[in-house]
Amino acid sequence: MIEDKGPRVTDYFVVAGLTDTSTLLDQEINRTDTNSIGPKAPITDIAVIIKSAGETVPEGYTCVEATPSALQANLNYGSLKSPELFLCYRRGRDKPPLTDIGVLYEGKERLMPGCEVIQATPYGRCANVNNSSTTSQRIFITYRRAPPVRSQNSLAVTDICVIITSKGETPPHTFCKVDKNLNCGMWGSNVFLCYKKSVPASNAIAYKAGLIFRYPEEDYESFPLSPSVPLFCLPMGATIECWDPQIKYPLPVFSTFVLTGSSAEKVYGAAIQFYEPYSQERLTEKQLTQLGLLTLVEKRVVSKPINSNKCICLLSHWPFFEAFKNFLMFIYKVSVSGPHPLPIEKHISHFMQNIPFPSPQRPRILIQLSVHDAFILSQPVSTPLPLSGANFSSLLMNLGPENCATLLLLVLLESKILLHSLRPAVLTGVAEAVVAMIFPFQWQCPYIPLCPLSLAGVLSAPLPFIVGVDSRYFDLHDPPQDVVCIDLDTNTLYVADERKNINWKQLPKRPCKSLLGTLRRLYQQLCSVHRKPQESSAIEMTPIEADYSWQKKMTQLEMEIQETFLRFMASILKGYRSYLRPITEAPSNKATAADSLFDRQGFLKSRDRAYTKFYTLLSKTQIFIRFIEECSFVSDKDTGLAFFDDCIEKLFPDKGVERTEKVDLDSAEDTRLIELDDSQRSEHTVFIMPPEPPPDDGNNLSPQYSYTYFPRLDLKLFDSPQKLKLCFNRHPPGSSITNSPALMAKRTKQEIKTAHKLAKRCYTNPPQWAKYLFSHCYSLWFICLPAYVRVSHPKVRALQQAHDVLVKMRKTDVDPLDEVCYRVVMQLCGLWVNPVLAVRVLFEMKTARIKPNAITYGYYNKVVLESPWPSSTRSGIFLWTKVRNVVHGLAQFRQPLKKTGQKSQVFSISGGQSDQGYGSKDELVKEGADGHAPEEHTPPELTTTELHIEEECDISAIVSKHLQPTPEPQSPTEPPAWGSSIVKVPSGLFDTNNRTSTGSTSTVLFSTQAPVEDAVFSEVTNFKKNGDRGEKKQKHFPERSCSFSSESRAGMLLKKSSLDLNSSEMAIMMGADAKILTAALTCPKTSPPHVTRTHSFENVNCHLADSRTRMSEGTRDSEHRSSPVLEMLEESQELLEPVVGDNVAETAAEMTCNSLQSNSHSDQSRDTQAGAQDPVNKRSSSYATRKAIEREDVETGLDPLSLLATECVEKTSDSEDKLFSPVISRNLADEIESYMNLKSPLGSKSCSMELHGEGNQEPGSPAVFAHPLERSSSLPSDRGPPARDSTETEKSSPAVSSSKTLTGRFKPQSPYRAYKDRSTSLSALVRSSPNSSLGSVVNSLSGLKLDNILSGPKIDVLKSSMKQAATVASKMWVAVASAYSYSDDEEETNKDYSFPAGLEDHHIVGETLSPNTSVSGLVPSELTQSNTSLGSSSSSGDVGKLQCPAGEVPFSRNIKGQDFEKSDHGSSQNTSMSSIYQNCAMEVLMSSCSQCRACGALVYDEEIMAGWTADDSNLNTTCPFCKSNFLPLLNVEFKDLRGSASFFLKPSTSGDSLQSGSIPSASEPSEHKPTSSSAEPDLISFMDFSKHSETITEEASYTVESSDEIKKTNGDVQSVKMSSVPNSLSKRNVSLTRSHSVGGPLQNIDFSQRPFHGVSTVSLPSSLQEDVDHLGKRPSPPPVSVPYLSPLVLRKELESLLENEGDQVIHTSSFINQHPIIFWNLVWYFRRLDLPSNLPGLILTSEHCNGGVQLPLSSLSQDSKLVYIQLLWDNINLHQEPGEPLYVSWRNLNSEKKPSLLSEQQQAASALVETIRQSIQQNDVLKPINLLSQQMKPGTKRQRSLYREILFLSLVSLGRENIDIEAFDNEYGLAYRSLPSESLERLQRIDAPPSISVEWCRKCFGAPLI
C-alpha cells in the first residue's frame, strides 16, 4: 500500500481492453428483454410508392405500413381524394448507408449540399407527398448518404417510421423527428417522418473488458483501485470486429464516468477509446465464423481487417475532465508516432507525480507536454456546493429550458430516470448536473452516469435511479415501461403513458416561473457562445491553445445556471428551519425518526395550498427525509447546508414569515448566491516543463522510442512512485467540518467570505467597526476554548464558563460574527459529556435570536443524542430549585418591610453583620470602646471588623446610588444631566473646605456606576426604574474599579484608617474622593449615641493624607480592579434608597455582600487599633450610606432568616465584644435570595475577599504590611503607614491569619479559630462574587449554576452543612468552603479585604503618618490581604477588562451580563493589589501604545483599533494624525517575583488561570498549624516604614504574606519550607498571591525617596523596576515587543496555526517561543475582555522567563494563577519629549511629604496641575487647553497631545471612576472648536479631539489602566 497524503491531481493510470481471461459479454447480460434479432443493418435506400395507383413494394425494400400506434402510415393520412403514399426502405452493407433524412418544400427552400431528392416513385410517378392539389406547394423527401470511405464509428440511419401527431402520436424512443409536416392542405392530418441513427453494427464479438495495465502497481491506502474500472472504461465491452476494407480507423473517443463508493465518495474517470489491429492468428475457428471471415461452405477465410478496441484511462478524485482529455490525447499521439527521446512511461509518471495540485496561491498550472502540446490545469471552482463534474451548460443546451424544468420535477419526486446519448462524454456531465441541480438534496438511490452493459440490469430495479447509457444499448434492449428516458441527442423526454401528465407545470408557480424565465435567457446566451465540442469524435490533434475568454464566459454561464436552480430550491424550501425539532431531552428510540426531527404538517401548512400535492409528495421522498436528517445531525454536507441557509437568508431575509413570493423573487434576482473565489480571477500560473530527456554523452546515442500502436507498458521505465504522497482529502478544501478538537472552531469558507464582506461594510461605520472588532475578540477566545477546557479541571466548570461568556455576549450586545462560538461549546459538551449544557447553549442561541445553521444544529443534535444523560430529574438540583423559589418568593414579600426598616434606622455602623453575612468567619464582633479588650480576650476569630464593610461602601458609591433616577425626588443639588458632566460628582463636593452635605448624602454625588449590581439584585430590588440602567451601564467596566470614592474604598479605609485622620486632612490628601467623603461625613457626626462604633473621617484622613498622591494611581487601578467588596457594595448600592441625613436607607438584605465582610475585617482591625486611640472617632459614618447597615451590634446573629434583622441597629457596648458564635448569625435568607438574583455565572470565582480579622501577631512582630512595591507610572502606588503597635495589631486582628496577605506572626489558634478561618473563606467566597451571598457563592463556585453545583459530593456537603446551620452555621460555611474549595482557594488567597478604602487605588496610606500611626487602615492583616486576588472572580485586577467609565459603556451593552461573566483573573476590578500579588510569581505589564514611524506621535490603543483595516492580511494601522501606515507593537515587561521568600509554587487543582479564577482542590484539612515566630525578624523589619518604606522588597512583602496566608490557611494543606521563614508554614491549596504594585498595600510607603515611584521610568509600572532584592530574587526577563495584530488578522493566523499544528499547540510550552506574536496578542485580548485563559501559565515555564531554559509544564491552570497581567494605556518608554506627563507630575508632586519643601518649579507645576484639576471639576476644558497651549514653545514638535495630557491627569487625579470619558470628549471637542484661530495655529494635529471611530473603539473595549 502506498502511503497517502495530500490532494493528487490523478491517482491511477489504467489500460483496459481484451485480455486472455475475458468472457463473452452475452454471458454477462440477461437477454430476456433484448430485441428479437439484435442490431440491424443500416438503411441504404428509401423510396415512395403510391399504393392507390397500384404500385407495390420494390424487391428488397420494406414498406412502413403502420405508425407506432398502429394507424395506417399513409403519408397523406386523413386527406380527401388524395393518393395513398407509403414509404419504403432497404437495408444492406453493400453500399454506404444513409446518414440523414429530410423534407424539402420546393420553391421555398434550397437543397442542402450532399443531399438527394426522391422526385419519382420507382414506377416513374411524381413523389410529391403533399396532400393538396397539384397546383399548390410540392413536398419531397430527401436523404444524405455517407461517403464511401468512412470511420468505423460514424452514424447511419438504422430505422425509420411515420407518426401522425394530430392523433396524439410522438416520436418513438430514440427516433428523431423531421419537423416538417408532409400535409400542407386544408384537409388531412399532420404527418411527420421520424428516423433513428446509430453506429452501424459490424461483425463483432463483445467481451467483458479486463485490466491490461495499471500504474502505480500498489493501491493507495485510502483509495484502492476498483476491479470494475475496466467495465466503465469500455461500457459496450471489449470487442473484436471485422471491418469492411473501406472503413478507416476512427479518432479516439473520449468518455467520462463516475464511480461512487460506499461512503458516497466520488471518483472521476476520464478515458480514451481507440482501435488497434488484432492478429488473425489469435482467432479461433468459432471466432472466425462469428466474424464472417470463414465461409460456411468452403471454409475459406476471407481477408478483411480485424481490430479490437482498447482504452487508456486516468482516475482522480477531481473532475479535471478537460485536462485529462488533453493529456490522454497526447499519450495516444505519442503511441502512434515516433521516434521520441522519452518513452510513454516517462510522460505518464511525470504527469502523475510532478504536477502540483492547483491551489488558491497558484490557481493555474500550465503543463507543457512537448513543443507542440500544452494545456492548462485550473483549480476547481471553489464554492460551498458539493464538488462535482456537472456541466450545466451541456444540460441546458441538450434539453432546453422546459425539459430541464420537467426533469427537475422528476428528480425531486424520485422517478426512474434513464439518460442516454451516443456521445459518452456528454452523459457524465449532464448526469452530474441532474444530481447537482437539486442541491441541498442529495440523490439517495442508484446513480451510474455511464452504465456498462454488464450492469444494465439496474434498469429493472424496483427503486428510483439515475442511470446513463450509450444509446446503442437500445439496439439490443428495450427500456422498461416505467422508466423516464431522456434522449440528449434529440432533446426529448419519454414518459410512460400513465405518467404523461407529469411536466414542469406541477412545480410551484412563482418559483417555476422565475426558473423558466432565467433558463430561457441563459439558453439564448448559450446558443450564441457555445462551441459544439467534438465530443463524439476525437480530440483535435493540433496544438491546444487555451481560449481564456471563451472559458471564462462558459464558467460564468455555468455558475449562473447552477445559481438559477439554487434559487428555485431556496424558494420552495424557505423557512424549513423553523420546523426542525431539536432534541432537548434524553433521546428515546424514536428521537431520530424524521417525524420527531421535523414538523412535516407545519411545513406543509406554510406552503402554497395550490401545490400541496407537490409538497406532500416531496416531503415523503428519501431525498427530503435524508435532508432533514443531515440538517439535524453532523454530516459531511453541513458546510453546504449552512451555505444553503445563507442563500435563503439572502433571498428571503425574513425566513420564518411567508411574504409574497413575488416580492421575494424579484428582489432575489439581483442577489448573487454563488461567487467566484478571488483565486479564480488570479492570473498566477505555474509553468511545468516536459520531462527532461536523458543527457546525450556523445558516445552512446540515447535510445529512441517509436510506436505503431499502443505498446505494452514497462514498469521499469516508470519513475517509482514517490514515497511521501499527501494524504488524500476526501472533500474539497473548506467543504468538510471535522470533529477533531483542533478544527472545532474552523470556519467554513462561506463564513470566512461573509466575515470579509461584513468587515468591509462595518469598516465605514465607526460604531459597527468597533463592535465588529470586539466580537472578533470573543471569537478568538472560543477558538482557543477546546485547548482551555482540555487543561482545565473540572471540565464542567470550564464549560460553564464558556456558557456564561455566551450569556455575557448576549447581554452586552455583542453580535457574533458567525456561529463558531456556539458550535465550539456544543462540540465540547459532546466531548466532555454534558448534553444538558448543550441544550442550554441552544436556548441561549434562541434567546439571542440566532437560528443555528446546519453545522451548529448538527453538532447540537449529535451531542444530545450520543451523550449519556443524567439519570434522574428529581435530583438535588430539582429540590434546591424548589427551595430557591420559596425563599425568593418570601424575599419579594419582605421588600416593603425593608424600606420601612431602613428609614427608621440610624446609619450607625452599617454592615456589621448583614453585610458580612452571618456565620461568616469574619463575622463582626463588637469591640469595646478602647478596641483593645477584644484583642486580649477575644479569640481571634471573633475579633472581626464590624465596620469593615461599612468602609467598603464608599460614599461616592452610596451617593451615586442615590444619584440614579429613583422614584424619590432628587436633591436639588444634583447636576441636571450627569451625562454631560465630566466628573461624575457634583463639583461642590470638591471644595477643599470640609463642606458638609448633611442632607445631601442621599443626593447624587456620582453617577451610578453599578450596572452590574443591578443585574444581580434586580429581581430583589424592583425599586429602581429602568432609567437607572442606562446610567448604570456606564459603569460597566471602569466604574467597577476600586477607586476610593466610587468603590467604597472610602468605606474600607474609613473604618480603620479614618480613625486616624481628620476630615479636612483627608480631604486634602484624597482630592475629590476625600472631599466627597468629607462632605458626606458631616452627617455621621450627629449619629446617635447608641452607635458605639463610628468612624470619623479624620482617621481616614491619616491614611489619606498622603495617599492622595497615590490616589490617582489607585484610581487608575481601581478602575480596573475594584475590590469585589466594592463591587458588592456597588451592587448593593443599587438596592439602597436615597436617604436624607443619617437615615441612610439601606437594603441590607440586598447587601449581603460577603465581600463586605472582607472589608469589615480590615475595618475591624483598623478599628481595633484606631479605636483604642480615638474612640470618639468611632462615630457613625454616614458616608457608608451605600451599604446596608452593618449590624455590628448583633451579638449572635439571631434570626438569620430575617431580612429585617440586617436592618436593626442595636446598641453595642464594649462588653459586646465578648465571644459569640459568629457563624450562626450569617443571614442565610439573604445568601439564598441573593443567589436567586445572582445572574453572574461567570463570576464564579468571586473575589475571595475574606474578612479576616487581623491575625494575632506576636507582640514583637510588627504588623508587617506586605506593602506592595509601587507600580509603574500607570499603576497606583500605595504606601501604607507603619503599623502602630504591632502587638496590638496582632491581637486585634485574629482574622488576619487567614488573610494571606497579612504579614506578621500569628499565635497558634484554637480549633475554633481554625474552622472559623474556613468559614471565612466561605464568606470570602461569597463575598467574592460581586453580589456575594450564599447564592453568589454557590454561583461563583463554578461559574456554574446552582444546578451544576448541586450534584455529586458537593451537594452532599452542602446538604449536611445546611443541617448544621441550624446549630452552628459556621460549620456549614466550613463545609461549603471546603466543598467549593476551589473558590476558597483563590478566595482565601485574596481573602482579606479589598484595600482599605481605596488604599489600593488611592494609596490612601499617607506618608505623613508617623510610624506609629498604627497601620490603621493598613493593618497588616487588613491591608496585606487584598480582598481579591487576581484570581478572584469578582473582577480581580481586571485591568484588561473593558473598563468604560460612565460614559464609555460599550454600546448598549447590558452591563448586567458583564458582571458575572468576569473571568476570575480579571474578575475583580476591585481587586486589591495586595492580594493580587500574594499568589503572584510573575507580573506582566503590557501596553499597546505605539509610536507612529512617520510623525513620531504616540498612538494609543483605541486609535490603533480605529486605524485597522478590514483586510485580514494587513498588519498595519493608520496613524490618526498623519494618516501614514505603521505597524503597532505590543510591549511586554516582566517582573519575576519567584525569587521572593514568600513566594513558592504549589500545585493547585485550580483549573483557572489567575485571570480565570482558581479552583483549589475540594478537600483540604482545616486544622491550623501554628507557625513559630522565627520568621518574625524578617517581617518586623518591614514595619518601620519610615525607614524602610523604600526598601521593602516585594520579597519581603511576600514573606509576610506567605506567613499570613499560611497561617490563615490553618495548615490546610501541607507545610512548606521557606527560606526566609524557616518553619514549615502550612499553606492552602493555592500558591501565595503576591500583593503587588497595583496600588496595593505592598507598595513602598516612602515616596519621598522615590519620587518616581508612581511613575515608572519604564513604560510600564514602576513595580517592574523595583529590583531591590533583599532576598535574592531572580532578575526579571527582558522586555518583549511583538506586532499588535488586529483581531481579524489574529483570527486568521490562529485558525491557520490550529489547522496546521492542532489545538494542542496552544497549551504546549513551545507556543510562546515559536509563535510569540499570536501568543502575546491572545493574552492581551483575553485580558482586555476579562476572559479566563490558561495562556499566562505558559509564561512561567517559557525559555524567555527562565534564562533560555524551557521548564516542564506542571499545571497550566495552576501556573496561570501565578501570573498577573496588567494592561496599561500609556507607555512612558516611548515618551521622548522633555519633561514628564502631567499625570506623572501630579503623582510625584503628591508623593512629596511637605509641600513647603517643593522647589519653585515644582510649585508652579503643582499650581498648574491643580488649576487644571479644578477646571475639570467645573466641566471647563477650555481653560486647561489655553493654559497648556500658552506654555508650549512655538515651533517645537510635541509628542504628548493636550487631549491626552488633560484626560490622563483627570483620570489619575480625580479618580477614574469619577470621570466620564465620553463627556470629557464632548467637552474637549466643544472647547477645541471654540478656540480662536490664533490659538488653533499654536496647536498641532495631535491636539485635535479623537474621531468618532476612536471614541467607539474605546467605548466597546473600555480604556486600559492609566
UniProtKB/Swiss-Prot annotation:
<feature type="modified residue" description="Phosphoserine">
    <location>
        <position position="1342"/>
    </location>
</feature>
<feature type="modified residue" description="Phosphoserine">
    <location>
        <position position="1626"/>
    </location>
</feature>
<feature type="modified residue" description="Phosphoserine">
    <location>
        <position position="1624"/>
    </location>
</feature>
<feature type="modified residue" description="Phosphoserine">
    <location>
        <position position="971"/>
    </location>
</feature>
<feature type="modified residue" description="Phosphoserine">
    <location>
        <position position="1000"/>
    </location>
</feature>
<dbReference type="InterPro" id="IPR005113">
    <property type="entry name" value="uDENN_dom"/>
</dbReference>
<feature type="region of interest" description="Disordered">
    <location>
        <begin position="1410"/>
        <end position="1440"/>
    </location>
</feature>
<feature type="repeat" description="PPR">
    <location>
        <begin position="818"/>
        <end position="852"/>
    </location>
</feature>
<dbReference type="Pfam" id="PF03456">
    <property type="entry name" value="uDENN"/>
</dbReference>
<comment type="function">
    <text>Guanine nucleotide exchange factor (GEF) activating RAB10. Promotes the exchange of GDP to GTP, converting inactive GDP-bound RAB10 into its active GTP-bound form. Thereby, stimulates SLC2A4/GLUT4 glucose transporter-enriched vesicles delivery to the plasma membrane in response to insulin.</text>
</comment>
<dbReference type="GO" id="GO:0030659">
    <property type="term" value="C:cytoplasmic vesicle membrane"/>
</dbReference>
<dbReference type="InterPro" id="IPR023341">
    <property type="entry name" value="MABP"/>
</dbReference>
<feature type="modified residue" description="Phosphoserine">
    <location>
        <position position="1637"/>
    </location>
</feature>
<feature type="compositionally biased region" description="Polar residues">
    <location>
        <begin position="1154"/>
        <end position="1171"/>
    </location>
</feature>
<feature type="domain" description="uDENN">
    <location>
        <begin position="191"/>
        <end position="363"/>
    </location>
</feature>
<dbReference type="GO" id="GO:0005794">
    <property type="term" value="C:Golgi apparatus"/>
</dbReference>
<dbReference type="Pfam" id="PF03455">
    <property type="entry name" value="dDENN"/>
</dbReference>
<dbReference type="InterPro" id="IPR043153">
    <property type="entry name" value="DENN_C"/>
</dbReference>
<keyword id="KW-0472">Membrane</keyword>
<dbReference type="GO" id="GO:0072659">
    <property type="term" value="P:protein localization to plasma membrane"/>
</dbReference>
<dbReference type="InterPro" id="IPR051696">
    <property type="entry name" value="DENN_Domain_GEFs"/>
</dbReference>
<dbReference type="GO" id="GO:0015031">
    <property type="term" value="P:protein transport"/>
</dbReference>
<feature type="modified residue" description="Phosphoserine">
    <location>
        <position position="1181"/>
    </location>
</feature>
<feature type="modified residue" description="Phosphoserine">
    <location>
        <position position="740"/>
    </location>
</feature>
<feature type="modified residue" description="Phosphothreonine">
    <location>
        <position position="973"/>
    </location>
</feature>
<feature type="modified residue" description="Phosphoserine">
    <location>
        <position position="1096"/>
    </location>
</feature>
<keyword id="KW-1003">Cell membrane</keyword>
<keyword id="KW-0597">Phosphoprotein</keyword>
<feature type="modified residue" description="Phosphoserine">
    <location>
        <position position="1043"/>
    </location>
</feature>
<dbReference type="InterPro" id="IPR011990">
    <property type="entry name" value="TPR-like_helical_dom_sf"/>
</dbReference>
<feature type="modified residue" description="Phosphoserine">
    <location>
        <position position="1274"/>
    </location>
</feature>
<feature type="modified residue" description="Phosphoserine">
    <location>
        <position position="1333"/>
    </location>
</feature>
<keyword id="KW-0963">Cytoplasm</keyword>
<feature type="modified residue" description="Phosphoserine">
    <location>
        <position position="1248"/>
    </location>
</feature>
<dbReference type="GO" id="GO:0032869">
    <property type="term" value="P:cellular response to insulin stimulus"/>
</dbReference>
<dbReference type="InterPro" id="IPR001194">
    <property type="entry name" value="cDENN_dom"/>
</dbReference>
<feature type="compositionally biased region" description="Polar residues">
    <location>
        <begin position="1292"/>
        <end position="1302"/>
    </location>
</feature>
<feature type="region of interest" description="Disordered">
    <location>
        <begin position="1548"/>
        <end position="1577"/>
    </location>
</feature>
<feature type="modified residue" description="Phosphoserine">
    <location>
        <position position="1620"/>
    </location>
</feature>
<feature type="region of interest" description="Disordered">
    <location>
        <begin position="1154"/>
        <end position="1184"/>
    </location>
</feature>
<feature type="modified residue" description="Phosphoserine">
    <location>
        <position position="736"/>
    </location>
</feature>
<dbReference type="Pfam" id="PF02141">
    <property type="entry name" value="DENN"/>
</dbReference>
